[in-house]
From Swiss-Prot:
Protein family (similarity comment): Belongs to the class-I aminoacyl-tRNA synthetase family. TyrS type 1 subfamily.
UniProt motif ('KMSKS' region) ranges: 231-235
EC number in record: 6.1.1.1
Protein name: Tyrosine--tRNA ligase
Amino acid sequence: MSNALIEELQWRGLIYQQTDESSIEELLNKEQISLYCGADPTADSLHIGHLLPFMTLRRFQEHGHRPIVLIGGGTGMIGDPSGKSEERILQTEDQVEANVEGISAQMHKLFEFGTDKGAILVNNKDWLSQISLISFLRDYGKHVGVNYMLGKDSIQSRLENGISYTEFTYTILQAIDFGHLNRELNCKLQVGGSDQWGNITSGIELMRRMYGQTEAYGLTIPLVTKSDGKKFGKSESGAVWLDADKTSPYEFYQFWINQSDDDVIKFLKYFTFLDKDEINRLEESKNQEPHLREAQKALAENVTEFIHGKEALDDAIRISKALFSGDLKSLSGKELKEGFKDVPQVELSTETSNIIDVLIETGIATSKRQAREDVNNGAIYINGERQQSVDYELSNEDKIDDEFTIIRRGKKKYFMVNYK
């Protein structure tokens, strides 16, 4: 079974580095193991940049291994320097606690908990907060050489601009985590992003020095990159969150369906549980009939349903179809706000009602002549309905939820008109 797991991870492109490739494969063939991946609660929600390590952990669970999901309630008070060019701003304890609560709830969407072989959720504050300063320095610090720490990329990259002792010690805390989970839960493998290699190997080295433990390994996954060089995980509005209140299921769905042909197959391998035959079929469809965007639809549908559920996916598809067809009447005010979040927002005084004056005041048209031409030519739509009368007066019936009106000029240029 585990040979199949390794083959699947390799086919999906999910293995970047391993501390001991042959020993890891032998271990996975020999027994069902416990393994872990962690996340610090830097916000009250995960974003899609967190997804890949945890989805990889979930793949281990699908093959019979037991995942340990670690929320860094302790390390989150310190701050990981990995991948950061400057010092993190420390959060208050209350902030960290609230973030732990939010992220813990999201983990229940990603993993199966509560069974004999279900995932285990832990918070490293439970043990790190019990270590005294004297114990930290004597029992742990004595086994970690400064030269060894200075050799870590996460430390080296910060030396020129400066790094606090607080963040300098972070790698020791994560090393303590691995040792604790190894002793208490027989955890033998840590999975993380490629930026976590230094922290993972620190844990393995600490266990070797403190306990003579050699059966502890690390596996990292690649940094997710896009073919156009842009950073993965960002939309025009910013980070793409798993929290539906921060990024609506519709926006989430749109993020995935808008992935390019160059990236979509890689992302299907990374972020879905579709099998090899189905992904190969979707790749063939992309190559032969790219206009159908079947691969993008499969990606968006699978990831959205996995994170938000079937009902939210159905709503996202319904909103998308209505916006594409221009059938705005079928959508609620809330859904329209979601759909038009990124279009130009313009303000209109409630005294202005004639359609020509509205187009001028909002800047949709630059002159009365242009406004009249647009209306006469059928280029202006009010809430999805074409308006060709230059004498048309906007009324309260044109105000959605008594707040806004959607005006379209031409085929695709939308504006959200808010009343002041």
